A protein has these predicted regions:
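Basic, amphipathic alpha-helical/coil surface patches used to engage anionic, phosphate-bearing ligands
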Residues: 1-284
Length: 284
């Protein structure tokens, strides 16, 4: 039995002995996706015990945090309207593309613990959705960092994002393209880059806007980030304002007002782009 089959056998045995520990989606991935297992083995230099421990940890986290149980409508329109995460487009090599917009990154560390945890869960949900979409294939994540200020750098939040990616994206095939990184935030960004594992650090490329089309055609990028595509809508159908989502009623209304005030420009862009005059509520 080779290492992949050995790892698969051990994880499936664990799942059988602990039926509530791993989500059925992940059990199916373990059964059918060799690449999923190979990445953990490669990340841990074929140390089967370490790979097994890391993989089981990831699968338990995915289940306990309910990442497979969520859909777009779980999260508030405010988060989508900012346009910080863009799951859209294909690269010049026909790879899946994900965009991150630095100037629209919110700072949630100064808000309530509940808002912080919701924002972190939103990132994890987007991560998982994208992870399943690319299905082991190489991909490109571009970060448009022009006009990004220090108010967009939330070190406490970003460190948790880095820790999550380090733990759950072993031997990643994603290339990170950082575009127009200004000198003001370069120091902070470099601190975060240094926290990434070696494999991820080696996938980072710095570029200015003139190099973007070497990777992604402009018609595969939304107009609001400098592309030419007008078909992308940041706010998915059925998504409502956080103020009227029953499962988010524990977050005070003033917290939502603070999110809107802090990120007003990006949110207004998102509303205009989606053909809306206001954030969708229970009546829209």
């Amino acid at each position: 039995m080779n290492q992949v089959e050995e790892l698969r056998s051990k994880v499936l045995l664990y799942a059988k002995e602990h039926p509530d520990a791993i989500h059925p989606i992940d059990i199916e991935r373990v059964k059918t996706k060799n690449w999923f297992l190979e990445r953990y083995l490669k990340e841990y230099k074929n140390d089967e015990k370490m790979a097994e421990t890391a993989l089981l940890y990831s699968l338990n986290v995915f289940k306990t945090e309910g990442l497979h149980e969520m859909n777009d409508t779980y999260f508030p329109a405010e988060f989508y309207a900012m346009g910080n995460f863009i799951g859209f487009g294909r690269s010049k090599k026909d790879l899946a593309v994900m965009g991150v917009i630095g100037r629209c990154a919110p700072n949630v560390s100064d808000m309530s613990e509940e808002m912080f945890e919701l924002a972190l869960k939103f990132f994890k949900y987007i991560f998982m959705k994208y992870y399943l979409e690319v299905d082991g294939e190489p991909a490109v994540v571009y970060g448009i960092l022009s006009k990004m200020g220090m108010h967009n750098v939330d070190m406490e939040f970003d460190k948790q994002v880095v820790a999550f990616v380090n733990a759950h994206a072993p031997d990643s095939k994603v290339t990170f393209l950082l575009i127009d990184l200004g000198w003001i935030v370069k120091f902070a960004i470099n601190l975060l880059i240094n926290l990434l594992n070696e494999n991820l650090r080696n996938k980072i490329r710095f570029a200015d806007w003139s190099h973007v089309e070497e990777w992604v055609a402009l018609d595969q990028m939304p107009k609001y980030v400098g592309g030419t595509n007008e078909g992308f809508r940041r706010i998915p159908d059925g998504v409502k304002s956080g103020k009227c989502l029953p499962h988010l009623q524990h977050i005070p209304e003033e917290e939502w007002d603070a999110v809107i005030q802090q990120n007003g420009e990006c949110i207004l862009e998102g509303l205009k782009e989606s053909g809306l005059n206001s954030l969708p509520d229970r009546n829209t």
